[in-house]
Amino acid sequence: LLRHCPPMQVPPSVPGTRARTAHYTSGVSTQHARKSSTSHVEGARSPRIGVIGGGQLARMMIPAAIELDLDLHVLATTPEESAARVSTHVMLGRHDDPEAVTAFARSVDVVTFDHEHVPTGLLHALEHEGVVVRPGPNALVYAQDKLAMRARLSELGHPCPRWWRVETEADLEAALHESGGDLILKTARGGYDGHGVMRVEALEDAREWLERGQPLLAEERVPFVRELSAQVARRPGGEIATYPV
């Protein structure tokens, strides 16, 4: 059964959106979601794009989706998340809840993400069912795990700072010695925007992290002037577009 929360009007100040009413459903059925995206023209409808996560990135997709005549659906944890406040199609559920994610995925044509923290095992299971996942779990793992990312970039020959896998005090001591005693230490998973990152000049600086027993990524400190992000898009057919910095 579907559980509907009170309708919510989109604030008119949100760029690129029209005044609309959002209907929230729990992640246990998809009948309402399927019917709600049907076009007024019999048999025709806009493609349904499902975004797992209701944060700022999902919210920024909404105006672009409207311009492209795409029907954007959002799986949000709560109605208070950024994208959930302005989307017309919101299903409530956690990104790591198999039942919620599966129900959501079955209600859309393609699944994508607001963040990288969806379990890849769950995504592999969805792909096995025939769900289209973009990017797929084999690519998403490199956004989830910094150690996997560094290993893959190094394997491909891309320039990287010197880096070390750290699991023990001995690992960190060796990395400190090789780097000259000045490292940036990062959690392999879960860090973002300054969280899960610390500067380490001695073993004691990182003892608490080492005691957690989780793999860490140590990198040499790199002097830099600025940080740039390059956006690249790829269609399933192989066409690639790069956007100017």
List the model feature ranges, each with a label:
Residues 3, 17-18, 157, 237:
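Generic detection of intrinsically disordered/low-complexity segments and helix-coil linkers/edges
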Residues 7-8, 12-19:
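Compositionally biased, low-complexity flexible segments
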Residues 1-2, 6, 23-151, 155, ...:
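ATP-binding N-terminal substructure of ATP-dependent carboxylate-amine bond-forming enzymes
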Residues 142-245:
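Active-site nucleotide/adenylate-binding loops and adjacent lid/helix of ATP-dependent enzymes
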Residues 10-11, 26-27, 33, 37, ...:
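Residue-level detector of intrinsically disordered/flexible regions characterized by low predicted structural confidence
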Residues 12-15, 58, 199:
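Generic alpha-helix initiation/capping and coil-helix boundary signal
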